[in-house]
Each structure stands twice: as C-alpha cells, then as structure tokens.
C-alpha cells in the first residue's frame, strides 16, 4: 500500500472512531486532475476496500442490473445476484451514464469488479426508494447483489 493510500485509510478510520461520517465526493470543487479518480462509483469502491467494508451500496435511478436497459426494453429482467463479474456481466453495462450521474451502469460494474475482487459484497439499488437501505442492512433481497470473492 502506498503512503497516500495509508494516509487516506488512517484519516477515514480516525474520523469513524470520532463518530464522524466521512463524505467523500469525486466531483468536489477541490478535486484536481492529478488526484482525480474519475467517478464516485470507483471512488466508493476504493474507499470500501481501504476501510475493509463488509458491503458497498451504490444507489442509481434503476432497481439494479438488468438483462437489458429497462428504460428502453420492457422485457428487461433484473438480475438479483451476480456470483462473479464476467465479460457477459460487464457487457450489460453499456456505454452511457444514467440521467443522474456521469458513469451509469458501466462505472457501477467497474466498482463491483474492484470490491468483489477484494472480497467485499456490493449492492446496486434504486436511490429513489431509500427505505431499501433498511432491507439491505437486514440482509433482505433488494436491488442486485454482487458477491465478493471468498477465496482470498
């Protein structure tokens, strides 16, 4: 782990020890090109890995990962669980962002790739239904769950 990552990790853990809720935002006005990650989905994955989170939850404008774009294809089916990130899963990410973000499903799948490789589960759920966070915290099915590798 490089010094920068260690400093970030120490800062986040100290803030958590103090009872603070760290807010980390890639689109912050103080973000510079030299330190920019590129999007909040990737940044959240990096932070989840650094703090050794049990679960990363990403909120979107749809209910999870679908077999096709549900905004365009009425036959699209939500995928409840993804045991591994495969080329087929990555292909479902498409190339464009959601109406609310810059990266859309593509960057969420990249985040899933990062955290699941580190052994952390991830959920993509609908941000317009914040009560889903209670279901997710209770272990109930909501959105799409990506399973972290357990062979680490």
Where on the chain are the PLM-derived regions?
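C-terminal catalytic "cap/lid" subdomain
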Residues: 4-152
């Amino acid at each position: 782990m490089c010094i920068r990552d260690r400093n970030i990790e120490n800062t986040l853990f100290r803030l958590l020890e103090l009872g603070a809720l760290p807010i980390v935002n890639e689109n912050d006005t103080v973000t510079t090109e030299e330190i920019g990650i590129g999007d909040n989905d990737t940044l959240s994955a990096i932070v989840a890995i650094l703090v050794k989170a049990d679960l990363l939850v990403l909120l979107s404008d749809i209910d999870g990962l679908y077999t096709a774009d549900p905004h365009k294809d009425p036959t699209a089916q939500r995928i409840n669980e993804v045991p591994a990130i495969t080329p087929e899963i990555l292909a479902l990410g498409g190339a464009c962002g959601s109406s609310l973000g810059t990266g859309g499903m593509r960057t969420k799948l990249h985040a899933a790739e990062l955290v699941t490789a580190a052994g952390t589960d991830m959920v993509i759920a609908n941000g317009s239904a914040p009560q889903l966070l209670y279901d997710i915290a209770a272990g109930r099915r909501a959105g799409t769950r990506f399973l972290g590798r357990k062979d680490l």
